[in-house]
């Protein structure tokens, strides 16, 4: 079971990725984790990646695809894997295909931008302890105050509306072509494209996912 996950920041992708990993016993493959591991291990691709990063440049698709090929050859990927954060572009998707890496399911979590902004802009944090709240879903006992210390809660920069909307803009620019690409792949019978309503309760989405992937 080889799965690609698509979903905007705040769409609940991470929660459902954990569910899939635990339910089906397949590892999540993150390109960032792979890069760090390869550099630390000093593999040939790791050395190439390190020299590129040290020069302040972006790691090429060729190196990333090579790392993915090495990673999925490992024993824990025998039953499949979950690709998160890759591919981000059409050339990367083409690269996977050219390397003979078949994708069984492309899973998209669909949540309207305004809902994501509400989810993220409603977050409040007590920075010294790391405790987090939400104005709607998990409000503090007293508005704007930490439950334990009574200290002021803040909105983290990442959760500010303008930051969230900027990240969503980047996501849509990158991902819209991929959604079209994998839609065509599904029509051609090369993969299955599954779309879920990410505004539903977490357990409900998990149940739908389990049924669709079973």
Swiss-Prot record:
GO biological process, one term: AMP salvage
GO MF assignments: adenylate kinase activity; ATP binding
Residues at which AMP binds: 31, 36, 57-59, 85-88, 92, 156, 167
Region annotation LID: where it falls in the sequence: 122-159
Location(s) in or outside the cell: Cytoplasm
Ribosomal protein in keyword set: no
Gene3D superfamilies: P-loop containing nucleotide triphosphate hydrolases
Residues holding ATP: 10-15, 123, 132-133, 200
Pathway: Purine metabolism; AMP biosynthesis via salvage pathway; AMP from ADP: step 1/1
Its EC number(s): 2.7.4.3
Gene Ontology CC: cytoplasm
Reactions this protein catalyses: AMP + ATP = 2 ADP
Signal sequence region: none
Role summary: Catalyzes the reversible transfer of the terminal phosphate group between ATP and AMP. Plays an important role in cellular energy homeostasis and in adenine nucleotide metabolism.
Sequence similarity: Belongs to the adenylate kinase family.
Subunit structure as annotated in this protein's UniProt entry: Monomer.
UniProt remark on domains: Consists of three domains, a large central CORE domain and two small peripheral domains, NMPbind and LID, which undergo movements during catalysis. The LID domain closes over the site of phosphoryl transfer upon ATP binding. Assembling and dissambling the active center during each catalytic cycle provides an effective means to prevent ATP hydrolysis.
Name of the protein in its database record: Adenylate kinase
Organism, as annotated: Vibrio atlanticus (strain LGP32)
Gene: adk
């Amino acid at each position: 079971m080889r799965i690609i996950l698509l979903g905007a920041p705040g769409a609940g992708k991470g929660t459902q990725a954990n569910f899939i990993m635990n339910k089906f016993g397949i590892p999540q493959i993150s390109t960032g984790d792979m890069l760090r591991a390869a550099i630390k291990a000093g593999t040939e691709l790791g050395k190439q990646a390190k020299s590129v990063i040290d020069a302040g440049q972006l790691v090429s698709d060729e190196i990333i695809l090579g790392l993915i090929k090495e990673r999925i050859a490992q024993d824990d990927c025998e039953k499949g894997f979950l690709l998160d954060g890759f591919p981000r572009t059409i050339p990367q998707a083409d690269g996977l295909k050219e390397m003979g890496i078949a994708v069984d399911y492309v899973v998209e979590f669909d949540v309207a931008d305004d809902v994501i902004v509400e989810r993220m802009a409603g977050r409040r944090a007590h920075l010294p302890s790391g405790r987090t709240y939400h104005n709607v879903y998990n409000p503090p006992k007293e508005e704007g105050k930490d439950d334990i210390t009574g200290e002021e809660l803040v909105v983290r920069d990442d959760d500010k509306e303008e930051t969230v909307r900027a990240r969503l803009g980047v996501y849509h620019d990158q991902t819209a072509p991929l959604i079209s690409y994998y839609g065509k792949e599904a029509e051609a019978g090369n993969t299955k494209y599954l779309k879920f309503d990410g505004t539903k309760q977490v357990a409900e989405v998990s149940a739908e996912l389990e049924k669709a992937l079973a």
